[in-house]
């Protein structure tokens, strides 16, 4: 890896893996993808304008702290464009997004605290195993679904960990 900070390089790799997984699933389902890039709030308007030009049926927002930071604006633009949106954070759904399949943040933070405790007690970070989150939650915003005219199947509602009325 060359150029950029280590954390930005890791984010780039994580994003590439997310995209690869989405592309593979889209191929299996016969869904045409349109890639849009938004690195900050200034890019959101143009990205949503592109979804309108391309007549997108829905939007998948990948997990990024940028998108978490601008969750209210993303929800607003999605509603304005009448675009059902799948997000990566529970907070984004609470801000008005349609749905998310997201890491349970309380579980994630608790797990991170265990790592910090081990390091503070003398463990070398390089010796600790890399672990992925294992608990995910489905969150659905019925108020947003109604406003968009999207019917959420009863089976999906029953599987949801949280339904926002």
Feature-to-residue mapping (PLM):
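Short hydrophobic alpha-helices and adjacent helix-cap/hinge residues
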Residues: 1-165
């Amino acid at each position: 890896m060359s150029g950029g900070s280590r954390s930005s390089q890791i984010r780039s790799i994580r994003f590439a893996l997310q995209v690869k997984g989405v592309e593979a699933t889209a191929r299996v389902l016969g869904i045409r993808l349109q890639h849009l890039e938004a690195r900050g709030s200034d890019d959101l308007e143009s990205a949503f304008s592109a979804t309108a030009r391309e007549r997108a049926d829905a939007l998948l927002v990948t997990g990024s702290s940028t998108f978490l930071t601008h969750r209210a604006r993303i929800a607003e633009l999605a509603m304005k464009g009448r675009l059902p949106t799948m997000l990566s954070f529970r907070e984004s759904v609470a801000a008005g997004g349609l749905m998310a399949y997201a890491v349970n943040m309380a579980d994630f933070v608790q797990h991170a605290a265990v790592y910090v405790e081990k390091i503070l007690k003398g463990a070398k970070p390089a010796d600790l195993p890399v672990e992925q989150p294992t608990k995910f939650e489905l969150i659905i915003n019925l108020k947003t679904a109604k406003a968009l005219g999207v019917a959420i199947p009863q089976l999906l509602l029953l599987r949801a960990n949280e339904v926002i009325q």
